[in-house]
Amino acid sequence: MTDSQQSKPKHVMMMAAGTGGHVFPALAVAKQLQQQGCQVSWLATPTGMENRLLKDQNIPIYQIDIQGVRGNGVIRKLAAPFKILKATFSAMRYMKQLKVDAVAGFGGYVAGPGGLAARLLGIPVLIHEQNAVAGFTNAQLSRVAKVVCEAFPNTFPASEKVVTTGNPVRREITDILSPKWRYDEREQAGKLLNILIVGGSLGAKALNERLPPALKQLEVPLNIFHQCGQQQVEATQALYADAPANLTVQVLPFIEDMAKAYSEADLIICRAGALTVTEVATAGVAAVFVPLPIAVDDHQTANAKFLADVGAAKICQQSTMTPEVLNQLFTTLMNRQLLTEMAVKARQHAQPNATQHVVDLIQKM
């Protein structure tokens, strides 16, 4: 290796598009790579949310025109091979122009042509799968990738190149104090149990409509913090209007500081997206997961089982969310010792060093 090659910073091209679940873990890794002196670029789609999320991140974006074909019409499926070929050549052109040394794919359809382009150019590929069930693109790329990272164990068949890393999460989540200390401190201070309901930025209509009637049946004094989405505030507030005196309820359109919300919660009720499950484990919070029933391959149930199978969480399928079932579940969970034990188990199964682990694997390629 020449002196000029030794002095050239490693150039890593990130590939992630479509949803925050793909983009945020990739961004955490990208920022860490930059801090270690790497040059980072990003392969994106022209209209994906990644363009907005990367706007102020000092990461150059290179776009290829690609869309998903899964479940779409016949004409789009027939045109798909030509679109994939065109997108692959576009990605190859960028990679040669930028002299890319390694490629890291985090999902989204952009990663398919990008991974194929890297393979054709002899550039090593790392992929990272956030969910417990591999998405279509990552399932295909796992055959050609040099390193396959999985957030949850056994997502891919056992192999020397498969590494269970966990999902990269934000520093403010990994910095949350231990669950045992937090739960014990609240008990010693005589504080009420805090129930946190999170439906995501848009809210989850099923949670907003079905949880208030069930919670109003509980006789235990509780603080309820219900994040319902901007468009559903009034409707959700109306369902709590006749709440009994033992319930103190705050209905919120969104939560700015999720680290603080996790830290103060005794029980969280939420969907089971990959990053949500990861953050719940990292924070160390007892959880009731309500998997999104329309999630592809029911991957949210698989995500939730990661914590439910070790006693750190309960799973309540949306189809079974009757007032009677919910009341029985919540009555069982209104036990501070049980919630503390669940929270401790959640933290025990967290992988707070996931970001650095993935970065190290990229650096070694």
UniProtKB/Swiss-Prot annotation:
Pathway membership: Cell wall biogenesis; peptidoglycan biosynthesis
Cellular localization per UniProt: Cell inner membrane
Top class in the EC scheme: transferase
Coiled-coil ranges per UniProt: none
Any Gene Ontology CC annotation: plasma membrane
Reaction equation(s) it catalyzes: di-trans,octa-cis-undecaprenyl diphospho-N-acetyl-alpha-D-muramoyl-L-alanyl-D-glutamyl-meso-2,6-diaminopimeloyl-D-alanyl-D-alanine + UDP-N-acetyl-alpha-D-glucosamine = di-trans,octa-cis-undecaprenyl diphospho-[N-acetyl-alpha-D-glucosaminyl-(1->4)]-N-acetyl-alpha-D-muramoyl-L-alanyl-D-glutamyl-meso-2,6-diaminopimeloyl-D-alanyl-D-alanine + UDP + H(+)
Main subcellular localisation: membrane
SUPFAM superfamilies, sorted: UDP-Glycosyltransferase/glycogen phosphorylase
Binding site for UDP-N-acetyl-alpha-D-glucosamine: T19, G20, G21, N131, R170, S201, I255, A274, L275, T276, V277, T278, E279, Q300
Keywords, ordered alphabetically: Cell cycle, Cell division, Cell inner membrane, Cell membrane, Cell shape, Cell wall biogenesis/degradation, Glycosyltransferase, Membrane, Peptidoglycan synthesis, Transferase
Enzyme Commission (EC) number: 2.4.1.227
Pfam families linked: Glyco_tran_28_C, Glyco_transf_28
Membrane topology: Peripheral membrane protein
One biological process term in Gene Ontology: carbohydrate metabolic process
Superkingdom of this protein's organism: Bacteria
GO molecular function: UDP-N-acetyl-D-glucosamine:N-acetylmuramoyl-L-alanyl-D-glutamyl-meso-2,6-diaminopimelyl-D-alanyl-D-alanine-diphosphoundecaprenol 4-beta-N-acetylglucosaminlytransferase activity; undecaprenyldiphospho-muramoylpentapeptide beta-N-acetylglucosaminyltransferase activity
NCBIfam families assigned: murG
Main function: Cell wall formation. Catalyzes the transfer of a GlcNAc subunit on undecaprenyl-pyrophosphoryl-MurNAc-pentapeptide (lipid intermediate I) to form undecaprenyl-pyrophosphoryl-MurNAc-(pentapeptide)GlcNAc (lipid intermediate II).
PANTHER family reported in the protein's UniProt record: GLYCOSYLTRANSFERASE, UDP-N-ACETYLGLUCOSAMINE--N-ACETYLMURAMYL-(PENTAPEPTIDE) PYROPHOSPHORYL-UNDECAPRENOL N-ACETYLGLUCOSAMINE TRANSFERASE 1
Protein's name in the database: UDP-N-acetylglucosamine--N-acetylmuramyl-(pentapeptide) pyrophosphoryl-undecaprenol N-acetylglucosamine transferase
Source organism: Acinetobacter baumannii (strain ACICU)
